[in-house]
Amino acid sequence: MIVFLLKRILLLYLIFFVPKSFSENLPFFKIKSYSEKKEFFQNDNEKVGYSLGVSLGNYVNESFERQKKMGINLDKYNILLGVQDAISGNLKLSNEEISTILQKLEKNLKNAAKIEFEKSEKENLIQGKLYMKKFSEMKGVSKTSSGLLYIIDKLGEGEEIKTKNAEITVHYKGSLINGTEFDSSYKRGKPITLMLKDVILGWQEGLKYIKKGGKIKLIIPPNLGYGSNRINEIPANSILIFDIELLDIKNI
């Protein structure tokens, strides 16, 4: 039961509190000199074990800072004490007490994550509206009744998209308003072929404004993108920016 609870708690950490980089934090213990470091370890296995311990410690350090901002305060000493006692088999709390405490921690983490999610969701809506307003005032930008913004870089020639059942081949780059790139077929080195009906609404609408060989920039509001859903690196209620090159069209 305790192991199961701990796995669920660690999963919550991974989803909401994963540190950007372990190297951003100082290790809990410091080695005074290179010579001491060289003499301390007897073989590679000892170094591997130590490295795993440092990674865990850095992870805990980063988690502390994130938790403090959410009103969850834990101390390093007792975590290290718990690890030590678990290894030695000399526990200071019963399994029943530990299970109850971990259940409460899991509940607190879920509540904290929900609050953080809602805060991020509202902030994205505010910043997104400001970005859309500013972008809409730029030269060459068109706006549709649905709220989609677009700039045609190259109209293309020949075949046009005539139905949602069309099969399209595209090169594209997707990013957020802060410049974070979340996907790119260019980086993968090859275009992607898919059915128009299977892509987000912003693509379905926007790609109809260009022909085969055309290029377009789409600024997609949440209602035409992923809405309030969090998709991998894309926060809820995000404005999506896509630069798309329409390479081929097959109207089926």
Curated annotation (Swiss-Prot):
GO terms for biological process: protein folding. The keyword Transferase does not apply. It is an enzyme of class 5 (isomerase). Its EC number is 5.2.1.8. InterPro entries: PPIase_dom_sf, PPIase_FKBP_dom, PPIase_FKBP_N, PPIase_FKBP_N_sf. PPIases accelerate the folding of proteins. It catalyzes the cis-trans isomerization of proline imidic peptide bonds in oligopeptides. PANTHER family: 39 KDA FK506-BINDING NUCLEAR PROTEIN, FKBP-TYPE PEPTIDYL-PROLYL CIS-TRANS ISOMERASE FKPA. One of its GO terms (molecular function) is peptidyl-prolyl cis-trans isomerase activity. Keywords: Isomerase, Rotamase. Residues 165-252 form the PPIase FKBP-type domain. Pfam families: FKBP_C, FKBP_N. It comes from the Bacteria. NCBIfam families: PRK10902.1 (NF008150). Disulfide bonds: none annotated. Belongs to the FKBP-type PPIase family. This is FKBP-type peptidyl-prolyl cis-trans isomerase FkpA. It catalyses: [protein]-peptidylproline (omega=180) = [protein]-peptidylproline (omega=0).
